[in-house]
Curated annotation (Swiss-Prot):
Domain HTH marR-type: 5-136
Key words, A-Z: DNA-binding, Transcription, Transcription regulation
Pfam families given in the database record: MarR
Isomerase found in the keyword field: no
Organism: Bacillus subtilis (strain 168)
UniProt keyword annotation of Cell cycle present: no
Protein name: Uncharacterized HTH-type transcriptional regulator YwoH
GO molecular function: DNA binding; DNA-binding transcription factor activity
Length: 137
């Protein structure tokens, strides 16, 4: 077994932690963490979702999403609304979050650009392709 095969998951985890740490630094002026940004990004990109849809999409445990949404709600970023089915609640961005979203997104896109600046376009395409394959398993 090659070095890469023995250590790839560890390297991916270390990279994810480093990226999350640096993302948190970018988001700190907005009072957000990367996990919260993931939920906001998800809601803006996909639209109103149930908590179950969010945790399913983000591949995280239900209690984690519940805590994250609770904090976002307490800080005025999201609100829960009655869904078409009376038993379900939809999580939606607040008007204030909609206003701030673009500013945060621009900052995060710049962060991503800087983070990947030393990579060739072909490398970025390969990363994207491999991660999509991995997520489809």
């Amino acid at each position: 077994m090659s070095y890469v095969n023995r250590h790839l998951i560890h390297q991916i985890n270390q990279s994810a932690r480093l990226i999350a740490k640096k993302a948190n630094e970018q988001l700190e002026p907005f009072g957000l963490y990367s996990s919260q940004w993931s939920v906001l990004y998800c809601l803006r990109t996909i639209g109103p979702m149930t908590q179950k849809e969010i945790w399913s999409y983000l591949n995280v445990e239900a209690p984690t999403v519940t805590r994250t949404i609770k904090r976002l709600e307490e800080n005025g970023w999201v609100q829960r609304r009655q869904g078409e089915d009376k038993r379900e609640k939809l999580v939606v961005l607040t008007k204030e979050a909609e206003k701030k979203y673009e500013e945060i997104n621009v900052k995060m896109l710049k962060f991503e650009e800087e983070l990947l600046a030393d990579f060739r376009d072909e490398d970025k395409e390969a990363f994207s392709h491999l991660f999509r394959m991995f997520l489809q398993q």
